[in-house]
A protein has these predicted regions:
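Conserved phosphate-binding/catalytic loops in two-lobed NTP-binding clefts
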Residues: 457, 475-488, 695-700, 707, ...
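Glycine-rich phosphate-binding/hydrolytic loop that grips phosphoryl groups
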Residues: 485-506, 510-512, 550-560, 603, ...
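A contiguous, well-structured pocket-lining segment that forms one wall/lid of small-molecule binding clefts
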Residues: 173-174, 181-183, 403-441, 466, ...
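Intrinsically disordered, low-complexity, mixed-charge
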Residues: 1-174, 178, 185
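A phosphate-binding glycine/aspartate-rich beta-alpha loop in the early core of alpha/beta enzymes
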Residues: 74, 219-282
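Internal gly/pro-rich beta-alpha loop/helix module
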Residues: 60, 161, 316-392, 590, ...
Length: 750
């Protein structure tokens, strides 16, 4: 008779892994035990079916569980007469992998809809297959006493389920019921409304066109009826958010199919237990008010992921709600009841609960480009799942702090990187405070208590750079600056385990190694270094950030043609006087920086075509340009010129203006401009790949959320015999910069 020890690592805590092992061993008549050893689960087996156990183990895992490594060894038999689950210990001191928050499972959903079930209409129903994890944990090991559920002692019925190995709630730390768990209440301003069904009250008020703040699993949403134009506009007014698209939540997939196009991969993602927001194209039956996603051809959509969401739909007759984060753009979501109840200037009512959110976590956002997944924001449902470093690196610990906007941080230990949830814009003090708190929380969860280096952006004035030096003093370690687009590139390279490549890096801004503003770059990169090979033509930015907010100023600078710009005089607040002042500013060089940003060029095209002349949110002008281009019916050729590896964008923009003033179709010009820029950058990349003897060309940066630009680069590069890669597990935008920083820093520590 055989005897073996099996050690498994991965997402094996708080996911029903030990009960699964228990059931599998019992099914195969095996004796022994299973127990947690910190970051490892140990399985001791005796019997004749051990090989069958090993074969079935990874194939029948619980929904949330994931095995990253499994080691087996023969051991001496001890003569066990049963199989048991024994008490955990901290024998291993490695990093425990805590699972992310997972959408309610079918079994729990069935219970809250069954009038005969004791959890009927209970909005916090959960089991080992679903529910909150990351948002409720304070420290490891993952036991109820170290979560926000510790405030809710189990009743006798729940305790019985908790202690039964064959029950799906066995050691489910988030389980509860209406007798022992959290409760919901509804308020109008500071006054509680007495009701035994506060969710029904909320559904009724939403039907009346009211705005409701709803505290959820990882934060708070502001919610209105998505079909109610008046309510949507009122929400915009109160938030001072005039144009940025609102995400929506629909009750089921059939509802989504009524207004959006869905591919098989999009369906699989939007219905997965991670339940991200997926950016979908509007279909011909789209019938929401224009105020919901103004000027865009797509809309962010998610399905319900908590019991409360399902109950909200069940109690009303609206199939789609606006669900937008209750925060100022770039600042952290509100998570405390005190904050939420002080929203009475924005929300009419507040639906809150008494379970603490220990780790706030925004909704994840995903966009597909021809069935290739791209994270816009990797957060709820994914954080804190780690990334593997696909290179030979040391075992030193690195904390990487990201750039300044759309920040995440990352902690690297051994060959793994533990990314944070979405943090936001650290030029806001509240967000910087949240970041510091989140770092402390992640240190407790991962048990990474010290760092050998702190990685950050090269920009000397970023708050994250200053924070890096604070941590450097605390841990008595070095600060390693990593160039912005190099970090982008290595995050992409790690997706594929590629050692070297040519990279097209396109975004709004990144601090260059020459202290200029980069953003349209052709780089040769490896994991330790990079070389700048080419870029977009550099242009002056009159007024610095003013040129970002008002892209008509950038257009003036790029085309540098008084006759062409004169047609746009009405877009300048002070008319011809302002135009003359800007030209004078460009001549003197006062408050004028140079940029090679692709984002600024696309914004200028948008301004030239009178699509968007004032930016009210990040990426607005470029996104609206893409949406206008989406409806193009005819191909227009715009010639481009490359000299010394620099793409001449002045002539491209001048041609855009000429075509528009000749009366060519706006959508066709927009489409042509995007594709011309993509072809020009691809041509520079191809020529340099040939010189360097490199056969892989990658695309990174926020511009590559643009489907037309990405597809054009891919087609052009592959037609020329090179391999084209794009982000598949990481953000194309700034959300992955910390990941790249961490990898570069670890290699430099070698």
């Amino acid at each position: 008779m055989m005897a073996k020890k099996i050690l498994t690592q991965g997402i094996v805590q708080g996911v029903g892994f030990r009960p699964y092992i228990y059931r599998l061993a019992k099914d195969l008549n095996l004796n022994g035990y299973v127990r947690n050893l910190g970051n490892v689960v140990e399985i001791i087996l005796e019997g004749d079916n051990i090989d069958l156990f090993i074969d079935r183990l990874p194939k029948e895992l619980p929904p949330i569980a994931k095995i990253d490594s499994m080691k087996t060894e023969d051991i001496a038999r001890e003569g066990f007469d049963d199989f048991t689950i024994i008490e955990s210990s901290d024998e291993f001191s490695g990093v425990s992998v805590i699972p992310p928050d997972i959408a309610i499972c079918d079994s729990c959903l069935e219970e809250i809809r069954n009038p005969k079930d004791r959890r009927y209409k209970y909005p916090f129903n959960a089991c080992t297959d679903c529910g909150p994890r990351f948002t409720v944990i304070d420290s490891v090991p993952y036991d109820r006493v170290r979560t926000s559920m510790d405030e809710f002692p189990l009743c006798d019925s729940c305790l019985e389920e908790y202690g039964e190995p064959l029950n799906r709630r066995y050691h489910g730390e988030a389980i509860c019921c209406s007798d022992c768990g959290p409760q919901m209440k509804i308020y109008k301003g500071p006054e509680e409304i007495n009701s035994n069904n506060p969710i029904k009250v909320a559904a009724d008020k939403l039907k009346e066109g009211k705005i409701i703040a709803i505290k959820g699993i990882g934060g708070t949403h502001l919610v209105v009826d998505a079909y109610n134009d008046k309510a949507v506009k009122e929400l915009r007014k109160r938030l001072n958010r005039p144009n940025q698209a609102f995400a929506v939540m629909s009750k089921d997939l059939d509802s989504v199919k009524g207004y959006a196009k869905l591919s098989k991969t999009e369906i699989a993602t939007i219905t997965s237990n991670k339940r991200p927001i997926v950016v979908l194209k509007k279909n011909d039956n789209y019938n929401f008010p224009e105020s919901l996603a103004p000027g865009l051809h797509n809309i962010g959509v998610m399905l319900p992921y908590s019991p409360m969401h399902y109950l909200l739909f069940d109690e009303g007759d609206i199939d789609t709600y606006v669900m937008t984060s209750a925060n100022t753009p770039g600042e952290p979501m509100m998570i405390t009841n005190k904050e939420i109840l002080n929203l009475n200037g924005i929300s009419d009512y507040s639906l809150i609960h008494n379970r603490k959110i220990l780790n706030r976590c925004d909704d994840s956002v995903i966009r597909f480009r021809n069935d290739t997944l791209s994270f816009i924001r990797r957060s709820r449902g994914y954080t804190p799942e780690p990334y593997k470093i696909n290179y030979d690196v040391n075992d030193l610990n690195v904390l990487a702090l990201g750039p300044e906007l759309d920040v995440t941080f990352a902690m690297a230990k051994d060959h793994m990187i533990y990314p944070s949830q979405h943090i936001g814009n650290t030029n806001k003090l509240k967000t910087l405070k949240f970041m510091k708190e989140a770092i402390e929380n992640m240190k407790r969860i991962t048990k990474i208590n010290y760092f050998d280096a702190i990685a950050c952006d090269l920009h000397p004035h970023f708050f994250t750079t200053k924070l890096a030096h604070e941590f450097s003093d605390e841990f008595e370690c070095d600060v390693i600056g990593v160039q912005h687009h190099h970090a982008h590139s290595i995050a992409l390279a790690n997706d594929y385990g590629i050692d070297e490549m040519i990279v097209i890096a396109c975004d709004g801004v990144g601090y260059g190694s020459d202290a200029a503003s980069w953003g349209g770059e052709i780089l040769y990169t490896n994991i330790t270094d990079f070389e700048r090979l080419g870029h977009l033509q550099a242009h002056k930015m009159p007024g610095g950030d003013m040129a970002t907010k008002h892209p008509i100023r950038m257009l003036l600078s790029i085309i540098d043609d008084e006759d062409l710009i004169s047609k746009y005089v009405d877009y300048f607040k002070y008319g011809e006087t302002e135009i003359k002042n800007i030209y004078r500013q460009l001549e003197t060089g006062i408050n004028v920086g140079l940029t090679t940003s692709t984002g600024r060029v696309l914004d200028s095209v948008s301004a030239a075509l009178e699509i968007c002349n004032t930016r009210t949110y990040e990426g607005e002008c470029s996104m609206k340009l893409e949406s206008v281009a989406y409806y193009s019916k005819n191909d227009i050729e715009i010639p481009f010129e490359i000299k010394d590896n620099i793409l001449n964008t002045r002539e491209i923009l001048r041609e855009v203006v000429r075509l528009y003033q000749k009366g060519e179709n706006k959508s066709d010009i927009a489409n042509a401009a995007q594709k011309t820029i993509a072809k020009g950058l691809s041509q520079i990349a191809i020529e340099n790949a040939d010189k360097k003897g490199v056969n892989v060309i990658g695309a990174t940066g926020g511009v590559f959320y643009n489907e037309a630009i990405t597809d054009t680069c891919k087609k052009y590069i592959e037609e020329n015999g090179y391999n084209f890669i794009q982000h598949k597990n990481t953000c194309a935008g700034d959300g992955s910069v910390s990941l790249g920083q961490a990898i570069v820093a670890k290699t430099k520590l070698n």
